[in-house]
């Protein structure tokens, strides 16, 4: 197997797919900014942590179970099939509290996120609708991860991009021609993963398919084994929720709703950026796990180096685009032409995105550690960048430098985490079953 050729095949297709996934919220934000102005952008940014939490569970279960599946398949273990069925069953159970919250207390959730009375009134039905579709968001992650690990990254990419295209088109149709407003945007976003799952299901009718659904009761043991390898994905997604929540409260204190709206612009482009680096990590994961399952450690390390090199190159391209087109990007979400919001978002984009020179390598390394069955190290890396370092840096730097301190927290936290990650990667690695 030509590892380099396979690496770029899997990674390129996965990047496109995950960029498509991030467009769920990016499209929402653009159309809602046109329909509801600054308050609409503020609402979306307050909802982001809820999306992140849903995606975090989907990522942990889906990527973790698929990684277990890939390792066991490479070792010829028949029990590999049980992980797919268990992932679907457990995701549906975990989705129940989200659905109940959406049905009975969406307003309370928005208040907890820092929304005032106007924002709560604006976003009540939007929040209710997307929370009720939680099982589909989670299962979409699982289907995509397993189809990719079963040797069909192209179908996974097509499924994700098709769902995203549906979301973009019907966001516009539901919000404007049909005049459904924000609930229409939520409905378009909620239906998108249903379409993606339907397309992924084609894999089960192909000759290359080795996946089967095993009739079984949900197993806590299999779930824990899956989550051990998917924890880096969970913390990676959760880190976005933590970062967004902490930044929202700091910015509300420093600049009010306009500060949160400015961060909404930064955060939405950050979703796309993070998706690119997750695409590198998740695209390499099936190949790394296969090498690990066959005890080809040199091949796994080669893939890690390819991943980090690719991440650095992409970070340079990404920052060049952000630096060169900052005003254009900000204007897309500034339908009210607020000079203050534009000023905040302009400096925020240019400072915040410096962090991706470090974050790209951290995301790839955390994915590698999970793929080679080193969940403890993967968790340490992910918790550092997602919780410990970012919260500490944001509190300290915002107190010292105000708004610019908030933006600087992300690159500072990622730089600290990269030093820790290099130390963890240099620790001796053993082959485990």
Question: What label would you give each PLM region?
Answer:
Residues 29, 38-41, 153, 182, ...:
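Membrane-helix interface/capping residues of multi-pass secondary transporters
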Residues 41-100, 137-156, 262-326, 359-381:
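Small-residue-rich hydrophobic transmembrane alpha-helices
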Residues 1-15, 69-133, 177-231, 288-355, ...:
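Short alpha-helical transmembrane segments in multi-pass integral membrane proteins
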Residues 29, 102, 145, 171, ...:
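Structural signal for membrane-spanning alpha-helices in multi-pass inner-membrane proteins
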Residues 14-63, 67, 130-137, 224-290, ...:
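Transmembrane helix-bundle signature of multi-pass secondary active exporters and lipid flippases
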Residues 53-56, 167-171, 197-201, 271-275, ...:
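Hydrophobic transmembrane alpha-helices of multi-pass small-molecule transporters
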Residues 26, 35-38, 72, 149-150, ...:
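Helix-loop interface residues and adjacent transmembrane-helix termini in multi-pass membrane transporters
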């Amino acid at each position: 197997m030509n590892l380099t050729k396979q690496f770029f095949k899997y990674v390129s297709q996965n990047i496109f797919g995950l960029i498509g996934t991030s467009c769920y919220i990016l499209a929402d934000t653009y159309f809602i900014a046109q329909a509801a102005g600054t308050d609409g952008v503020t609402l979306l940014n307050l909802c982001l942590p809820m999306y992140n939490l849903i995606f975090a569970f989907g990522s942990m279960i889906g990527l973790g179970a698929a990684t277990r599946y890939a390792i066991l398949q490479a070792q010829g273990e028949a029990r590999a099939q049980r992980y797919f069925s268990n992932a679907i069953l457990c995701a549906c159970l975990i989705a129940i509290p989200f659905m109940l919250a959406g049905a009975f207390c969406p307003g309370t959730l928005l208040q907890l996120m820092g929304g005032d009375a106007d924002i709560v009134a604006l976003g009540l039905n939007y929040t209710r609708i997307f929370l009720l579709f939680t099982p589909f968001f989670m299962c979409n992650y699982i289907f995509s991860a397993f189809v990719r690990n079963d040797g069909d990254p192209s179908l996974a990419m097509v499924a994700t991009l098709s769902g995203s295209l549906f979301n973009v088109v019907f966001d516009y149709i539901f919000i404007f021609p049909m005049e459904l407003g924000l609930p229409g945007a939520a409905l378009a976003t909620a239906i998108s993963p249903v379409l993606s799952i339907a397309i992924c299901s084609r894999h089960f009718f192909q000759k290359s398919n080795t996946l089967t659904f095993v009739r079984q009761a949900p197993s806590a043991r299999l779930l824990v084994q899956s989550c051990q390898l998917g924890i880096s994905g969970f913390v990676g997604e959760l880190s976005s929720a933590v970062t967004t929540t902490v930044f929202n409260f700091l910015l509300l204190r420093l600049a009010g709703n306009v500060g949160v709206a400015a961060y909404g612009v930064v955060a939405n482009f950050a979703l796309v950026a993070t998706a690119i680096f997750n695409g590198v990590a998740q695209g390499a994961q099936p190949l790394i796990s296969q090498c690990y399952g066959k005890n080809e450690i040199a091949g796994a390390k080669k893939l890690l180096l390819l991943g980090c090199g690719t991440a650095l190159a992409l970070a340079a391209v990404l920052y060049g685009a952000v630096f060169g087109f900052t005003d254009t990007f900000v204007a897309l979400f500034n339908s009210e032409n607020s000079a203050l919001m534009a000023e905040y978002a302009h400096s925020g984009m240019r400072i915040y995105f410096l962090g991706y020179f470090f974050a790209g390598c951290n995301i790839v390394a955390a994915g590698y550690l999970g793929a080679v069955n080193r969940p403890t190290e993967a968790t340490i890396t992910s918790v550092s960048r997602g919780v410990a370092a970012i919260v500490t840096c944001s509190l300290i730097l915002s107190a010292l430098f105000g708004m610019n301190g908030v933006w600087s927290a992300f690159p500072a936290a990622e730089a600290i985490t990269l030093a820790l990650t290099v130390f963890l990667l240099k620790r001796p690695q053993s082959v485990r079953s």
